[in-house]
């Protein structure tokens, strides 16, 4: 049996610059099907299942290199390969907020959940990947209910708004805010701005989706870039579009609208950046980026972090055991079928020689009990080896000793406990009136 292995390719702000993460993310459509892609403001991760992870990785990286224009060596060096328990442990930590720029943020759990939904909408997702992401979501819920991590509701957006508020003397209810983008982060940003008292709120979308976005969320749709930036004193970039606002464009708009030199806070949360970093050279303009937020994010309590790490580690270990158990279940079922087939063939010979008698029925009953006892040891041992990560050795032994060729288990395969035992073959003779003690 060829064993399917879970693996992930991880590129995050912790290892490479956000510009590279953004360009890799832009090429995600080139990645083969049957994968789940997690792309956020500071990470691009690919989760997949393959019999040969090295080959699958090479194919994905080649596709990304072609789509992004990056050199293959740069694409390869940008990713960290995770296999085994590390895959689950990493994803569960991400979903729980442990690996975020703002530790404990809650938005990431929703992004993990949506990543699976988006993948399932596009194509069939392998069972192991579905279970991986579903378990990640459950782990995030456990962290939320059992620890104080993220209890203060901090997120990248909230910390960024805190920084913008600290640097401005204008009260929140007097600010004029514009949100760039119409995605999930834009929706979260609008909600947080309203919580702080901002009522003069506009949305700008270079793709023209602002009107539909504000129709269900409130606010005003800015029809042009000049309208969006002309009177605002707070701008939050969440779009990640290809149309980056340059320093020259912003300076020109501020000059034409008579706002040059006036205070303007720009929060750029887009992975591919909505604003050129050079805007900080303009008078009165302050730029806050994801890196700014990461450095300023308050630390969580040590006890909450430790509790979360324990929950994540246990969940990852349990998940890995469940994967190993599923793979060895197929071998256990195959061994039972093989043994029962031998028994049935032998009983056919007994009946052919001695007829369908009470004695033959007694022999069959005794043999089936013996086979059940003989299989108990190998079944228990299979579970023990699976728990130790040695299920491959067990499967190889069955193939060598009995010549049993196993097929890869399907995602919907029944666990061993739910597979009914093989019933003894029925005998057409009614032996109810026969005294079994006389047939020995």
Swiss-Prot record:
Pfam families: GlutR_dimer, GlutR_N, Shikimate_DH. Pathway: Porphyrin-containing compound metabolism; protoporphyrin-IX biosynthesis; 5-aminolevulinate from L-glutamyl-tRNA(Glu): step 1/2. Gene3D superfamilies: Glutamyl-tRNA reductase, N-terminal domain, NAD(P)-binding Rossmann-like Domain. GO terms for biological process: protoporphyrinogen IX biosynthetic process from glutamate. GO terms for molecular function: glutamyl-tRNA reductase activity; NADP binding. It catalyses: (S)-4-amino-5-oxopentanoate + tRNA(Glu) + NADP(+) = L-glutamyl-tRNA(Glu) + NADPH + H(+). NADP(+) binds at residues 181-186. Substrate binds at residues 40-43, 100, 105-107, 111. Possesses an unusual extended V-shaped dimeric structure with each monomer consisting of three distinct domains arranged along a curved 'spinal' alpha-helix. The N-terminal catalytic domain specifically recognizes the glutamate moiety of the substrate. The second domain is the NADPH-binding domain, and the third C-terminal domain is responsible for dimerization. Belongs to the glutamyl-tRNA reductase family. Catalyzes the NADPH-dependent reduction of glutamyl-tRNA(Glu) to glutamate 1-semialdehyde (GSA). This is Glutamyl-tRNA reductase.
């Amino acid at each position: 049996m060829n064993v399917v292995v879970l693996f992930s390719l991880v590129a995050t702000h912790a290892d490479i610059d956000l510009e590279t993460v953004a360009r890799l993310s832009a090429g995600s459509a080139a990645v083969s099907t049957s994968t789940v892609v997690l792309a956020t403001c500071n990470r691009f991760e690919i989760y997949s299942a393959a019999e040969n992870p090295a080959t699958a990785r090479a194919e994905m990286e080649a596709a990304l290199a072609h789509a992004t224009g990056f050199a293959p060596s740069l694409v390869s060096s940008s990713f960290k390969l995770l296999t085994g328990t590390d895959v689950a442990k990493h994803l569960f930590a991400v979903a729980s907020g442990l690996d975020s720029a703002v530790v404990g943020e809650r938005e990431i759990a929703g992004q993990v959940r949506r990543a699976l939904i988006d993948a399932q909408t596009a194509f069939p997702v392998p069972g192991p990947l579905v279970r991986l992401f579903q378990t990640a979501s459950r782990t995030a819920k456990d962290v939320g209910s059992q620890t104080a991590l993220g209890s203060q509701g901090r997120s990248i957006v909230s910390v960024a708004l805190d920084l913008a508020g600290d640097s401005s003397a204008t009260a929140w209810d007097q600010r004029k805010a514009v949100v760039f983008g119409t995605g999930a982060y834009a929706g979260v940003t609008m909600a947080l701005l309203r919580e702080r008292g901002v009522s003069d709120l506009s949305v700008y979308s270079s793709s023209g989706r602002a009107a539909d976005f504000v129709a269900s969320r409130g606010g005003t749709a800015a029809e042009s870039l000049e309208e969006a930036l002309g009177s605002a004193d707070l701008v939050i970039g969440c779009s990640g579009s290809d149309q980056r606002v340059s320093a020259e464009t912003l300076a020109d708009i501020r000059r034409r609208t008579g706002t040059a030199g006036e205070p303007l806070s720009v929060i750029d949360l887009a992975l591919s950046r909505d604003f050129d970093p050079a805007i900080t050279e303009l008078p009165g303009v302050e730029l806050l980026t994801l890196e700014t937020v990461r450095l300023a994010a308050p630390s969580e309590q040590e006890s909450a972090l430790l509790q979360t790490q324990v929950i994540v580690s246990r969940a990852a270990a349990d998940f890995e055991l469940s994967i190993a158990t599923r793979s060895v279940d197929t071998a256990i079922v195959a061994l039972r079928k093989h043994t029962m087939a031998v028994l049935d063939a032998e009983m056919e010979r007994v009946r052919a020689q001695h007829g369908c008698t009470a004695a033959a029925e007694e022999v069959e009953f005794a043999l089936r009990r013996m086979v059940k006892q003989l299989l108990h040891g190998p079944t228990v041992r299979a579970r023990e080896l699976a728990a130790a990560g040695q299920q491959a050795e067990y499967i190889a032994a069955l193939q060598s000793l009995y010549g049993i060729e196993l097929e890869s288990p399907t995602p919907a395969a029944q666990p061993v406990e739910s597979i009914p035992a093989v019933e003894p073959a029925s005998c057409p003779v009614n032996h109810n009136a026969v005294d079994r003690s006389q047939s020995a």
